[in-house]
Amino acid sequence: MPDDAAFDTKAFTGIEALLLSVIDSRVRFVTGVAGYPATALMELLLKHQLEGYKAFWMTNEKTALEKALGASVTGQRSMVVVKHVGMNVLSDPLMTSVYHTIGAGVVIIAGDDAGARASQNEQDSRFYGSLAEVALFDPATPRGVYDAVMHAFQLSEQAKVPVVIRITDRLLDSKGHVLRSRQNETTATFDKDIWKLTTKGKHQRFHRESMPLLEKAVQTTSLNWLRPGNSRMGIISSGYISVLVDKALSEPRWKGHAHLSLQMVSPFPFDMVRQFISECDEVLVVEETEPYIESHVAVTGKVKGKMTGHIPYGQVEAEHIGYALDHLGESRIGKYTEVQTIKSRGSRPLCQDCPFMPLYKCLANIDVMVAGDMGCSIRAAPEPLQAIDTGFALGSAISTACGFKDKGIAVIGDFALAHSGIVGLINAVGSVDDVVVVILQNRVAAMTGGQEAPDLMSVVKTLVSDTIVLEMPAYTSDTSNDAEDRLKGLLLSKMDQKGVSVVYLLGKCTKQ
């Protein structure tokens, strides 16, 4: 323990612990892209950037990591803050950075949305540890978050690769004490001798020099801990779920069960897990959101979890753990098979005073395939509007519409256009596709807190000569019918034309 390490008498939330770790690890450069549950963390980091680091909102996760890598190779510790689907976007430079090597430490915070409260999927960022061959931490408590960041920067510089830390909303909201210690300024540098190696040679170097360091770290870290029991039943967990498991095991009927909590899960700690399983007759794996740990150990025949139906896929609650413990005698159960519907969950409709409501009402009455995007427009897909047919990913609307069998319409927000949708528009022009693109410009990322969106109108007009700009008035029942009729006539006329047409709709988000 460092000499200056000390418990802070105040209890911190997970998000506050992350801020403290950024300050104490002497981070100098932070980039982030808005998206639940990462937005609140990035906003806090922006608020406190006078603490010695610079922080920047970025338009897209790939550029966020690339900018951080630029900071790294010039000696600045950097952090990248994204939501889980943002990991998909930054995966290209992440994969190659492992071969390329870095300079000062790079830590990526991946905000997972277990329960899909505000996301298009529930993907589990832990799998990026295996895919990218990087260390990945899954802390359980505010102290675990703080310690993970401090360890991650040191490990990143030793192994010369980025490190990923997975967080969730419940972890960020949880409270606990933090053992603080101040690290020295980094002296890590980027070694240009890497260019003496071929690409294959770089990968060989990684497995000879970097991977052994990561494997040693996961087998020796204090972040992975065992609470022994006096029964032959054991539980393995990771992340915030470890807290729920501990609470369950405080009940008298389950108090004797052993608990192995993994807060560093990549590289997978096979030795520790193998030893734990060998001492148990039965093992329950409790984790969010996919069976990452379970898939590594299911072949032992002792393990139960998501794959056996004992634990639900997605978010895990305390009652799920209790039910699983009560039914360990069953080899497989089918309790968690009911599919959630919008009716059972409750609808999340568009704001009734949205300036773009006339567009959605218009689209609902046009017999044309409409590709939506990961913004407010996706809320027009369910009943009662049913105005949008598809919605795959942020920035996907234009390319999706270009693939329709017959000419279709793409509806995309200005932030999604800047994030990645502009590439789809460039391809549409280059391929001479038949498509009508409706761009909703309110100059903010309305779904993620109102971050400013770049204005690409001049770029779009340069790309597409057939670009029309319309002002959308504040929505009222009096203005709706006129605006709806005007849009319907315009869109139908564009559908009769060949090539790419763009309709820019300018409106002000009433939430901002």
Model-derived regions: residue spans:
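Flexible, low-complexity linker and terminal segments
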Residues: 1-27, 139-350, 355-359, 364-368, ...
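Short acidic, glycine/serine/threonine-rich loops at helix termini
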Residues: 41-44, 67-69, 90-94, 116-123, ...
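A glycine-rich helix N-cap at a beta->alpha junction
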Residues: 50-57, 100-111, 189-195, 432-443, ...
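Short beta-strand segments
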Residues: 81-82, 107-111, 164-168, 236-237, ...
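Short helix-loop-beta junction
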Residues: 44-51, 246-259, 461-465
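Thiamine diphosphate
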Residues: 1-142, 170, 229, 256, 381-502, 506-512, ...
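Short, glycine-/Ser/Thr-/acidic-enriched flexible segments
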Residues: 36-37, 85-86, 111-114, 141, ...
